[in-house]
Amino acid sequence: GREEMKKLESSLKNMVIVLTGVTVVAGALLGYVNELTKEPIAQANAKALSDAIAIVVPGFDNNPAEAPETIELEGVTYKIYKATKGGEFIGAAVESSANGFGGALNVLVGFDKEGNIIDYSLLSHAETPGLGSKAADWFKKGGKGDITGMNPGQKALVVNKDGGQIDAITASTITTRAFLKAVNNAYAAYSGQNVDGSSGATPVSYTHLTLPTNSLV
């Protein structure tokens, strides 16, 4: 009867109080864990970026990651890490991205003073693991789609299926197009920011880098 109802109400209230307590404690713990891991994650990301910059524009004696420049093209913001040696500008690493088969493909591309590609590093991707690991090496020196030494200012990088000069990753034209788009865009950002004459990279208009319509992802 009434006693049982009261007991039930009382135990329900207790349960709510306990659950609320658990939620608050769990939330606080999560926040604490987030705080604990935030710094190491940020440090790991910073180290990964510094390592990638050293791969794509070797030979600098400054700290390019310290003060990146940003440039906006077509509503997209690009980060440019300038490399110098003995105070002389030797090139830059540009962070760029494009949408591949599974999502964003983030690439760091290194250019010398003239705008030639030195190397690249695939920072992150949402492709299937096989495609991602292929893209990480495919366009490197000695790879089937080697882009090193090429200058997108002289000729935009286009996959052979679209009449270009770059061999597509086996069975993945979409990932290849996305990658090359990211590289072309990186060059556009690189040449666009060099208004001070510190680079011999030819500024290119964005239209020059527009790929054939059938190649858009």
Name these PLM-found stretches:
Residues 1-5:
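Short, Lys/Arg-enriched N-terminal segments with co-localized hydrophobic residues
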Residues 38-51:
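Alpha-helical transmembrane signal-anchor/signal-peptide segments
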Residues 76-108:
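Structured beta-strand/loop patches that form or line metal/cofactor-binding pockets in enzymes
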Residues 152, 156-205:
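Extracytoplasmic/periplasmic C-terminal soluble domains
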Residues 98-105, 113-172:
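Flexible, solvent-exposed short loops/turns enriched in glycine
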